[in-house]
A protein has these predicted regions:
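N-terminal secretory signal peptides that target proteins for export/translocation
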Residues: 1-12
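Bacterial N-terminal signal peptides
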Residues: 19-28
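Boundary at the C-terminal end of the N-terminal hydrophobic targeting segment
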Residues: 29-33, 37
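His/Glu-based metal-binding/catalytic segments typifying zinc-dependent metallopeptidases
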Residues: 68-70, 77, 190-198, 202, ...
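M16 family metallopeptidases and their MPP-like homologs
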Residues: 71-83, 91, 109-157, 163-175, ...
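Hydrophobic, small-residue-rich alpha-helical packing segments that form membrane-like cores
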Residues: 175-247, 253-256, 260-271, 275-302, ...
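Non-catalytic, conformational "gating/processing" segments within enzyme and secreted inhibitor domains
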Residues: 180, 186, 235-270, 726, ...
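Extended, domain-scale alpha-helical bundle/helix-rich regions
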Residues: 461-492
């Protein structure tokens, strides 16, 4: 259960930076409510440890909200309410373009240089339906101040208003280098959206908005549609900035331990004093329609894609007038419907075994709505699904929900508050605050929403939930069914249409126009080259090598063996909660039992037990534990990378409040020892759903496939594990989903025999993080439970069936028109042990060669080099090309040798990497990481301190050594590409293996 985050306190005394006279003057001004043109309007308490202060600039109307606390991870964000009135993506395009330089900082590359070469913990920008926001954070107030100056100048005085090339680079441009070539389009935003539109779930969301709210601001895609992005004009970008980027249409959010007067004076003097209050027209001509509608959107996939049970059917309806208390009621309804025991889930399991269902309310929008969504179904299932839905809604509107479904929120909210206070995330805080402001007009609305959520256990009742259901679900004025249907072969058809578009565009051009476009491309390339020579980093880099703290805390874990059981115990002093895990080594099983056990641990918590019905079990779970997990997990052993060494465990664990400890152990025992495998339909249904969700989940996030395969590509000994836990396992699940009862019965027998081997105290590692008092209770509970386990002798097996190692070049086909390319190699093949200084040199390769070449010149959204003890690899993200990218990769060593690697350059990259270590972790996180290192036999005391020292040791003399490593990667690395079928098949000679399992 997730909730609004609260803020943690790091106690420290506030540093004074003004002289005494100015300080007294400013303090008095604040007491009386005014300072540097700002008036202190409100003070409010927020969460456990933050006071929120709202300031308004009297001349310009700008507002500043300060999250006043002692957190030293300080943050800034400025938000503007923005709207889209078409699908060109102007809000998104300007977000990119304004960070491509200002007249004070006339460098199109500076922002990206700052991201990687200053002492920051976060820098980015983002566009949503209602607003655009620009957040950054740093452990240094000085660095934060310098970084936000770049943001503010880029926002209010962007160079894109006078330099069109920034727009061409960041949005889109047409490429033609000779009269014989075909025209193409590229650009960061354009290629980013090509990648996003490859994800069926994202496309379903975007086009369902168009369906429910046609031609409203909410219907338009603020990020842009690739075909429409091509129509952007320079003048439209200028007009967009003039309309929306005004102080009176903004809120600045500040967070943490800062000198507020310094910031207020800066905002007033450098910006807001130059502006008057202005209103912004947010008129939306949309007129809500009434009645019921249906529509189908055809999602393009390649011809070999299996489209059976791959559609999304959404029943959507508006909820005008919804209140905060109604939203809480909907949260309870959502929780209730998501339970496997709910009437919805049980009926779907019977009628549509592969279907995945969820209910959601989108309320932070101009036009709030609810959706009942069914995944993994077919278009022709619509009528039957709507009949089930109608019956389910009638039940919600006639039967009161058990009050225990409300009571569970008290447990979850308390636990979430504790965890979020331990691990504050200022960027999340500020972005959410901006979103809530943009949905109304109150910059402190986020506090009201937070307080409303915390009231849920008292404000929501069975009666109020029934009333909310009746008010909004029974007869909505505006409703409909939207279907997203994948169509095999449509991707190829769309690709041909794209080729025709560019061919027709060229055919329509005169010879003079063609030559002009060629010259424009030459001029653009020259501009890119000239721009790379501009280096303004010294103007904004504040923290240098000598200022970086060389200190890091460490923790100790008790690692002992008693009664044949291994214990990994971490004392979490003063903790209000406990985390505990029973881990069973899967190497105790013969390989033929691996997949049955993997399925079994996925089934746990979703089947009734010998003592409890499924509904009773779910209520037991939500009223006792905060979170629970029954799964199988594998971890690579660093000292055994070349032999495929793996820790592979079946895990039963939970996190709970101290006062819920006894109930949580009782729950774990009930699930682990008493689950019954009698519901064959449920087993079939789960197997099918898991297979679908795993394939679709990875194919919808191709970068995750690339990352996993980059490790396997570097260490081919893990090929067998990849097949066993991915491709072969999914095929096994597919078979289970259609097994007759007799075969399911045989499968259950295998699972029961495997349990007798696996759940064995000689095969157990017990992990626990708790305070001292709770730890003794945990150990007592563990002994009581494990006394019921088998104590037979355990024999270790080779768990993964042998597979031929992956070849040196692999491609994976997923839907879409975007590619993710990688070249990878192990450190063993490089003949080196990992040293943290290599991370700094990899950043030089990334930011001085790969990123500017592949993003600025060729339009890939991102490119990077990365090195760790696992591997050394280069990769591209949302890339429009395949072969050209590998040409760039293979020129890395030659290009790296040309880079002037100075102490000054290294210091910039060092400071960014260093911030990851200097930020610190909560005690819980440190203990979790230390337990993990014990599990994989990679224990090292003061690891962070050692890496800090290695980072600081980097010098220009290391360039030659690292250049040799790059050369080995070029010559011996494994290549991996994930993406659409057309370029993979067009370059099929590059690949020894093409995997299509992700589009089954």
């Amino acid at each position: 259960m997730k909730t609004k985050k609260t803020i943690s306190i790091k106690t420290a005394q506030k540093k004074l930076t003004l002289c005494a006279v100015l300080f007294i003057f400013s303090l008095n001004a604040l007491i009386f409510g005014e300072s540097f043109g700002f008036k202190l309007v409100k003070k409010r308490k927020y969460g456990q440890s933050t006071q929120v202060q709202l300031y308004e600039h009297q001349k310009s109307g700008a507002q500043v909200v300060w999250f006043k606390n002692d957190d030293t991870n300080r943050a800034f964000s400025i938000s503007f309410r923005t709207r889209a009135y078409d699908d060109v993506g102007l809000p998104h395009i300007f977000e990119h373009a304004c960070l491509a330089g200002s007249h004070k900082y006339p460098s199109s590359n500076l922002f990206f240089q700052m991201m990687k070469q200053t002492y920051n913990t976060y820098m980015n920008a983002s566009t949503a339906k209602l607003f655009t926001y620009y957040p950054c954070s740093s452990l240094s107030e000085e660095q934060l101040f310098a970084n936000l100056d770049v943001y503010m100048n880029g926002i209010y005085d962007p160079i894109v208003l006078t330099e069109e090339n920034d727009l061409k680079r960041e949005a889109v441009r047409f490429v033609l280098n000779s009269p014989e070539e075909e025209i193409s389009a590229t650009g960061a935003v354009y290629n980013e959206l090509l990648g996003i539109f490859a994800d069926k779930a994202s496309v379903n969301y975007y086009y369902s908005q168009k369906f429910l709210f046609p031609e409203s601001c909410q219907s338009y895609i603020t990020g842009g549609v690739p075909a429409d992005i091509r129509n952007v004009t320079w003048q439209s970008v200028k007009d967009f900035h003039k309309k929306y980027y005004k102080p009176s249409n903004s809120v600045i959010f500040l967070y943490g331990k800062i000198d507020i007067n310094r910031f207020l004076e800066y905002f007033d003097h450098d910006f807001f004093s130059k502006y008057e209050k202005e209103s912004v027209d947010f008129t939306d001509t949309y007129i809500p329609w009434e009645g019921y509608r249906e529509a189908v959107y055809e999602f393009p996939v390649s011809k070999e894609t299996n489209t059976d049970n791959a559609s999304i059917i959404s029943y959507m309806f508006t909820i005008p007038g919804v209140t905060a208390d109604n939203i809480n009621d909907f949260r309870v309804i959502n929780h209730y419907l998501s339970q496997e025991s709910s009437w919805f889930s049980q009926t779907l399991k019977e009628k549509f075994p592969l279907a995945k269902f969820y209910f959601d309310c989108e309320t932070i929008l101009l036009y709030p709505y609810c959706v009942f969504q069914f995944d993994n179904v077919n278009e022709e299932d619509k009528d039957q699904l709507m009949a089930i839905l109608k019956e389910g809604i009638n039940r919600l509107c006639t039967e009161k929900i058990d009050k225990r479904y409300i009571e569970v929120f008290a447990n979850g909210l308390k636990m979430s508050t504790i965890l979020d206070e331990e691990n504050p995330n200022p960027i999340d805080e500020l972005s959410l605050a901006g979103l809530f402001w943009a949905s109304g007009n109150d910059p402190l609305y986020f506090i009201d929403r937070y307080n409303s959520l915390m009231r849920l256990p008292k404000s929501s009742t069975p009666e109020s939930i029934l009333a909310t259901a009746r008010k909004f679900l029974l007869s909505p004025a505006q409703s409909g069914v939207f279907i997203t249907k994948p169509v095999a072969g449509l991707a190829e058809k769309k690709a041909e249409e794209e080729k025709k578009y560019f061919a027709d565009k060229k055919a329509s051009m005169s010879k003079e126009e063609i030559n002009r476009l060629i010259e424009e491309n030459k001029a653009f390339d020259k501009w890119l080259s000239d721009n790379e020579k501009i280096n303004l980093l010294d103007k904004v880099k504040v923290i240098g090598k000598d200022n970086l703290p060389e200190e890091a805390s460490d923790v100790t874990i008790t690692d002992k063996t008693e009664d044949s059981k291994r214990y990994l115990l971490g004392e979490n002093r003063g903790a209000q909660y406990v985390s505990a895990e029973f881990r069973f080594d899967l190497h105790s099983l013969p390989s033929e039992l691996l997949h049955p056990v993997m399925l079994y641990f996925s089934l746990l918590e979703n089947l009734e037990t010998s003592n409890l019905s499924l509904e009773e079990l779910e209520l037991f779970q939500t009223s006792s534990v905060y979170s629970s997990s029954f799964s199988t997990q594998f971890m690579s052993i660093p000292s055994q990378y070349e032999s495929g060494g793996t820790v592979f465990d079946a895990v039963a664990g939970f996190t709970c409040l101290n006062e819920k400890l006894s109930d949580s152990f009782a729950y774990l025992e009930e699930v682990l020892l008493n689950t019954e495998l009698k519901d064959f339909d449920a087993i079939r249904s789960y197997a099918g759903r898991i297979a679908k969700s795993r394939r679709q989940g990875l194919s919808g996030n191709p970068i995750n496939i690339l990352i996993e395969l980059s490790f396997v590509g570097a260490h081919p000994s893990y090929t067998s594990r990849f097949y066993a836990t991915r491709l072969d396992y999914w095929d096994f699940l597919d078979r289970v989903s259609t097994m007759p009862d007799e075969e399911i019965r045989e499968l259950v027998e295998k699972i029961e025999s495997a349990k007798k081997i696996l759940i064995n105290k000689n095969n157990l590692t017990f992990c626990c993080i708790a305070d001292k008092k709770q730890m003794s209770k945990c150990l007592k509970a563990e002994k009581a439970i494990s006394s019921k386990f088998s104590a037979e002798k355990v024999t270790k097996h080779e768990i993964f069936p042998a597979k031929k190692p992956f070849p040196k070049s692999i491609a994976v086909i997923v839907p879409g028109n975007s590619w993710y390319n990688c070249k990878t190699i192990s450190l063993e093949k490089l003949g080196k042990k990992f040293n943290a200084k290599y991370k700094v040199l990899a950043s030089v390769l990334s930011e001085d060669y790969l990123f500017p070449t592949l993003r600025y010149k060729y339009g890939a959204y991102h490119a990077e080099a990365s090195i760790s003890k696992e591997s050394f690899y280069v990769f591209s993200y949302r890339d429009p090309a395949v072969k050209n990218t590998y040409d760039v990769f293979n020129n890395s060593s030659a290009s790296f040798e040309k880079i002037d690697v100075t102490d000054e350059k290294l210091e910039g990259y060092l400071s960014k990497i260093y911030s990851y270590f200097a930020g610190g972790e909560s005690l819980t996180s440190q203990l979790e990481n230390k337990i993990y290192s014990h599990l994989i036999d990679d224990v090292e005391d003061n690891r962070d301190l050692r890496m800090m020292k290695e980072l600081k040791s980097v010098s220009p003399q290391d360039k030659e050594e690292f250049s040799k490593l790059i050369k080995i990667l070029e010559n011996e690395g494994t290549i991996i590409t994930v993406g659409g079928a057309d370029q993979i098949y067009a370059n099929k000679n590059m690949f020894d293996l093409i995997i299509t399992d992700f589009i089954k």
